[in-house]
Every structure is written in C-alpha cells, then in structure tokens.
Regions:
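Flexible, glycine/proline-enriched loop segments at strand-loop-helix junctions
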Residues: 31-32, 94-101, 154-163
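Residues at alpha-helix termini
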Residues: 48-49, 117, 154
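Conserved active-site and cofactor/substrate-binding residues in soluble primary-metabolism enzymes
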Residues: 33-40, 101-105, 163, 167, ...
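Catalytic cores of processing enzymes, dominated by hydrolases/peptidases
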Residues: 131-177
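Internal, conserved structured core segments that host functional sites
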Residues: 99-148
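N-terminal short beta-loop-beta anion/metal-coordinating cradle
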Residues: 2-95
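Predominant activation on well-ordered alpha-helical scaffold segments within soluble catalytic domains
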Residues: 39-46, 111, 169-176
Length: 177
C-alpha cells in the first residue's frame, strides 16, 4: 500500500526553451473561465502577433486520467510566449487550479518569472457576466488609483459595484501587486 502524498510537495516544473530579449515587457495572463473567453482571446493574440513559446510551467491537477483502466497524474500546462516586436509576454494556461493553495503557488511562480523577465505590469483576462451590448466593453479592476486613471483614459470601464475577482485572476492580481 502506498502512503498518500500531497501534491503541494511536488515542485512546479518550469522549463525554459529560450530567453527572449525584452526590455521592461508587459505580461498578459489568461486561463479558461466562463466560455473560455480569456483563453481564446489570449491564444488569438499570441497567434496574431506570432509570439513564440519560451517556457512552460507544469503542475499536477487533483484529477487522475485513465486509459485502458490505468491511471496517471494529469499535468496541467501553462505556456509562456514572447513577442520581441511587441515587447510582450503572454501566459496561457490549460486550466485553473481547483485548490486555492495551488492558485497561490502558481500565481507566485508566474510572478517570479515575470520579475526575472523585467515585467513591471501584468494584465489578466477573464469574462465578466453582463447585459448584452451592441458594442463590446472592457471592464477592469485596478491595483491603484494611477493605474485606474490611466486605463480609464484608454476606454477601460471601471466595475462600479463592490465585488470579488475569483480564481487565478484574483490571486494573480494580488500576488503581482
């Protein structure tokens, strides 16, 4: 009989395949959520600007997969892409951790990589349930007043009510702040 173990003891595996040449890049991070909107948008952006993968983070989800009756741990991948032309890093994940502690651990690892790459600003993407509008809108929450004012000038609308940012998006904002 095997002794149960905690996935928290398994280190997050980061593999770099390249070190892009960037100067104070911006990072956009996205994970699947409502309607996969953020992941689809980030994947579209990375393809559109021809960003190249330079790293991958793997961690294990609390799900086992099986094939022909044999189970194995299912790694979840978060790929990091860079566009030197746009001075941009895009982090796209296959899934969000289902355990809050794992969200914190993953957000810290992404933040560590961002710091190592010289990133000063991280934007996360997520869908926001709202009424249908003919013209799409972009809503945001901000880590400080100066960022709020700057982004409102670009057309980002502030979410007016109090609320919460759930999942990895909220944790990433908190860790990066």
């Amino acid at each position: 009989m095997q002794i149960p173990f905690s996935v928290y003891w398994i280190p997050l595996d980061v593999q770099f395949t390249d070190k892009p040449s960037l100067k104070d890049p911006v990072m956009i991070a996205a994970w699947p959520g409502m309607g996969f909107l953020a992941k689809i948008s980030a994947d579209y952006l990375r393809r559109r600007i021809k960003a190249k993968q330079f790293a991958e983070i793997k961690y294990f989800h609390n799900v086992l997969v099986y094939k022909n009756g044999i189970v194995e741990m299912a790694p979840i991948k978060h790929k990091l892409y860079a566009s030197e032309d746009q001075n941009l890093i895009i982090c796209v994940g296959d899934a969000q951790p289902s355990v809050p502690e794992e969200s914190l651990r993953l957000a810290q690892k992404i933040s560590d990589i961002a710091v190592e790459m010289g990133v000063k600003r991280i934007y996360t993407m997520a869908a926001f349930p709202n009424e249908f509008y003919d013209e799409p809108k972009v809503y945001g929450v901000f880590t400080d007043e100066s960022m709020r004012d700057e982004l409102i000038e670009t057309g980002v609308e502030m979410i007016e009510n109090d609320g919460a940012v759930n999942g990895l998006n909220g944790v990433m904002i908190g860790v990066a702040k």
